Amino acid sequence: MLKTNLKLSKDIKTDDVKTFCKKIDKIIKTLIGHKLITFTVIDNNLKFCERIYSNNSKIYPIFGQKKMPKNIWSEKVLKNKKHFLCKNKKDIKKIYYDYETIFSLGCGSIINLLVLFNKKPIGTINILHKESHYKKIDLKKIDYLTTYLIPYFLDHQKIMERKI
């Protein structure tokens, strides 16, 4: 059986982000499945984000940056502080500028799991699978995992601040 109850003192090493992210990746893959997963940290001003983990770093490289969009996604995730579920390719095409890359990987549904600290968005876990794979219930199965990422995301925000 997969261990899903992480113990902060034993399982998490704040200096080993990649190993920890791989553990979260494995748990999510077991609980709801995925073809692609990335973790992104949002800067303090909510202007851009930076990828700190990817299970496909050839297509979605680590430390890749992008500006935060101004669309329905940013309204729901950044302003209303809610997780985001996109169930099909039609909706993905409306929202994500890199939809062609997403589709080329065989993905057609997306969960963006919001990571909050003190009620402020600090990052997302981005989980992708085939079209119509994810349902609302899947969010509830995995949203507890976001709390384990908070120390890593806060540390990376400090690194991002030094780059500006």
Per-region residue spans from a language model:
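Signal-transducing coupling segments at domain and membrane junctions
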Residues: K90-G106
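Short, hydrophobic-rich beta-strand element in sensory/regulatory alpha-beta domains
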Residues: K23-K29, H34-D43
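Sensory-domain boundary capping and coupling elements
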Residues: L116-H129
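A short, aliphatic-rich beta-strand micro-motif
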Residues: S109-L116
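Juxtadomain coupling helices with adjacent low-complexity linkers
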Residues: V17, H129-I164
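GAF sensory/regulatory domain recognition
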Residues: F39-P61
